[in-house]
Regions:
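Acyl-donor (CoA/ACP) binding surface of acyl/acetyltransferases
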Residues: 1-51, 68, 83-200
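Short histidine-centered catalytic/ligand-binding loop motif
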Residues: 52-57
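Active-site rim helix/loop that mediates acceptor-substrate recognition in acyltransferases
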Residues: 59-80
Length: 200
């Protein structure tokens, strides 16, 4: 049994990205583990939490699929998909989820997204999370450009993205499909030199 634990430890360290976990003042953005299922599902079933996300509210099976994909992505090399748990640094309590996906490797471009459980809205955690993702993208992955999509009605996210220095580049008409309707999205982006100039 001891050899198996050593092998598993070596394997995990081989796949662990040097940019992870991401530290912010109050949070850790870390890789998901299987034991996070109940904490993720608790918030992912909430229609208010998933109102502006691409999917949700989740069924049990949806959360299982999400976590399975997140765990599988951790072992792909080169790694291009970072779906991460947002947890309190002090006690590892899960507040939500975030992600950074390298969507255009040749152009060094990535896409970020996030959601937080309702009890944690209005405390600056979303801004802290996005700042952490930008650090991972620009410093850890050496990306040139990071984008985000945002529903025009999602005033909180618009405020958050603009606060971290992302600029609105346009309105994508009928870009996504949810609740049986095609919906417009705002496109936000930030370049590496803009992030550096803003003092990270």
């Amino acid at each position: 049994m001891q050899w198996w634990n050593m092998f598993r430890s070596l394997t995990n360290s081989f796949y662990r990205h040097p940019g992870l976990p991401v530290n912010t003042s109050r949070l850790l953005l870390r890789d998901f583990v299987a034991a996070d299922h109940a904490s993720v599902h608790r918030y992912a079933v909430d229609p208010k939490v998933t109102q502006y996300t691409e999917r949700g509210p989740n069924r049990e099976a949806d959360t299982k699929v999400f976590l399975a994909h997140a765990l599988a992505a951790q072992r792909r090399l080169p790694r291009k998909q970072f779906d991460l748990a947002v947890v309190l640094k002090q006690d590892d309590y899960l507040l939500g989820a975030c992600g950074l996906h390298v969507t255009q490797p040749l152009r060094n471009e990535g896409y970020l997204g996030y959601w937080l459980g309702r009890p944690f809205w209005g405390n600056g955690y979303a801004t802290e999370t996005v700042k952490g993702l930008l650090t991972l993208g620009f410093q850890g992955l050496e990306l040139h450009r990071i984008i985000a999509y945002c529903c025009p009605e999602n005033v909180g996210s618009i405020r958050c993205l603009e606060k971290v220095g992302m600029r609105q580049e346009g309105r994508l008409r009928q870009h996504t499909w949810k609740h049986g309707l095609r919906q417009d999205m705002f496109l936000y982006a930030i370049l590496a030199h803009e992030w550096q100039r803003a003092g990270r």
